[in-house]
């Protein structure tokens, strides 16, 4: 409930100070399986044959500010191969608030980051593999010139619906 109030207050705050009209954007994705017995593969379907992962993302942009939230549902059970932490759960998975100006980019909440080819740090999401190791914290990117970016991050890795 506290997360929902935070999101509503962020959206309300950006709407009340608006000089121009912002816009909403987002998407919905649903991955569903209906499991059946397969004697050729010697596979017995589990009792809960229907499994579904659903993601609803809603973002709002107003000038230099962007706010977003992603709601996730793993009902009645998560797809096979997913962590058991997700089974039967639904909740707000990620949320963020971003401010971007000429040389500064500040993000608070959940974000993804990769340095180079990802050997030092790589946080990313691949829904088909069940990977979402977003960082929850703050990220500041300062770009003083076209060829130099200074990035500072602080946060904890997402694990299920927790950090």
Predicted regions and their residues:
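Bacterial Sec-dependent N-terminal signal peptides
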Residues: 1-25
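Outer-membrane beta-barrel channel domains
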Residues: 20-163
């Amino acid at each position: 409930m506290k997360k929902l109030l935070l999101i509503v207050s962020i959206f309300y705050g950006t709407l009340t100070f608006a000089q121009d009209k912002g816009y909403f954007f987002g998407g919905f994705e649903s991955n569903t399986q209906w499991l059946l017995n397969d004697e050729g593969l010697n596979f017995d379907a589990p009792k809960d044959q229907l499994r579904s992962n659903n993601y609803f993302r809603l973002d709002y942009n107003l000038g230099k500010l962007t706010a977003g939230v992603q709601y996730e549902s793993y009902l009645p059970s998560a797809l096979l191969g997913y962590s058991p932490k997700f089974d039967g759960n639904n909740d707000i998975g990620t949320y963020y608030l971003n401010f971007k100006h000429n040389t500064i980019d500040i993000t608070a909440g959940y974000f993804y980051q990769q340095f180079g080819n990802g050997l030092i740090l790589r946080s990313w999401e691949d829904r088909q593999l069940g990977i979402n190791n977003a960082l929850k914290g703050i990220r500041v990117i300062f770009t003083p010139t076209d060829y130099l970016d200074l990035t500072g991050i602080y946060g904890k890795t997402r694990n299920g619906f927790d950090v």
